[in-house]
Amino acid sequence: MLISRPRGTSDLLPGDTARWQRVEAVIRDLCRVYGYGEIRTPLFEATELFQRGVGDITDIVEKEMYTFTDKGGRSLTLRPEGTAPVTRAYLENGLHAVPQPVKLFYVGPMFRYDRPQAGRYRQFHQFGVEIFGAADPAADAEVIALAMHFFDRLGLAGLELHLNSVGCPGCRAVLRRKLADYFEPRADELCANCRGRLRKNPLRLLDCKEERCREAGRGAPVPVDYLCPECGGHFGRVQRYLDLLGISFKLNPCLVRGLDYYTRTAFEILVPGGGAQDAVGGGGRYDGLVSAIGGPAVPGVGFALGLERTLLLWSRQAGEEVLPQGPVVFIATAGETEETATVLLSGLRAAGVPADREYTGRSLKAQMKFAAKLGARWVIIVGKDELEAGEVILRDMGAGLQTRVSLGEVVERLRRDARG
């Protein structure tokens, strides 16, 4: 019986990875331009990191984490998101002691036990950035600008930026009381999840996608109505910077995000009409996260974008087929010439020319068809008669022309051609 991949995962074949590499190249180039250094953290962390950082009453921690106990009795969790691990690494490696701000980016897999659907997997990939040590609202605008620039570089159109402020802990304490007072008489109108949230974190009721909860919350208090003067001023400056940068946005008073560490700015980037899973990414400010996991009070802001969703949207909009890069040169053999083909192949690769050779013993005609399928620009035909004359046949696959070339000169000729 064939063993299948686990549900909610995917295999990326060469045709897929060519598209991923294009996206990753855009990420790395943009982060270089914006001044972010790459960070890579472990795939698993202490479970406590996410309980303290993400929030132990969030859906992620309560329902979606892959948690296990290792042989030493330690509780470990496959990372469900990237910000808490990057924050832990920032602290543990002393980056809080160097001149601030510190600007980091990451690309890698995350893990959540969620219901698989289009663009949503149990192992999924995120591109994220974090700025530590910058409380200025201009930093909020910068990470938003970087995210929008990323989608623009991919040629994706029609995305909407939704913006809100969830305030500071002082603002939210007042808002929570107001929300509890509003929703408690309407508890019977809420879904089961929201009835639980009402007792634990009523702010999350604003973010529910269930129609019955949306209807019940139409007159509910919203964060922007309870911002303190400092948070209100910060939010106004973020909007001003976005206006200066020419970045359009929609104010969404019910946007709260699903992680407890957010303070002040919260944003999402959405595909209009995309349904419940229309967000391709989001982020915001998290000024209390560093201290929540044992560090000093350091402000932070960042985002995370879902790469599977981004690639799904890219394929729908662009329809561009990115083929895997085949060899520039394919070496075909005719007769007992395999040893010469092997030495020639090694010489081409040493010269930096992408090359491959025949390994299956098929006919010369079949080899030529295979080379065409690979997209090879040139084919070197190593035949017994030609070798006796110290030559090979070099075929230009695009022009359909071929010529005899000295065996000692063919590598240098193709090296020059490959470099253009």
From Swiss-Prot:
Phylogenetic placement of the source organism: Bacteria, Bacillati, Bacillota, Clostridia, Thermoanaerobacterales
Residues forming coiled coils: none
Keywords: Aminoacyl-tRNA synthetase, ATP-binding, Cytoplasm, Ligase, Nucleotide-binding, Protein biosynthesis
Subunit structure: Homodimer.
Catalytic activity: tRNA(His) + L-histidine + ATP = L-histidyl-tRNA(His) + AMP + diphosphate + H(+)
Keyword Ribonucleoprotein: no
Listed GO CC annotations: cytoplasm
InterPro entries on file: aa-tRNA-synth_II, aa-tRNA-synth_II/BPL/LPL, Anticodon-bd, Anticodon-bd_dom_sf, His-tRNA-ligase, HisRS-like_core, HisRS/HisZ, HisRS_anticodon
Protein name, as recorded: Histidine--tRNA ligase
A Gene Ontology BP annotation from the UniProt entry: histidyl-tRNA aminoacylation
EC number: 6.1.1.21
Oxidoreductase keyword on record: no
Localization annotation: Cytoplasm
Superkingdom of source: Bacteria
Membership in a protein family: Belongs to the class-II aminoacyl-tRNA synthetase family.
Chief place of localization: cytoplasm
Record-level Gene Ontology MF annotations: ATP binding; catalytic activity, acting on a protein; histidine-tRNA ligase activity; transferase activity
Native source species: Desulforudis audaxviator (strain MP104C)
Top EC group: ligase
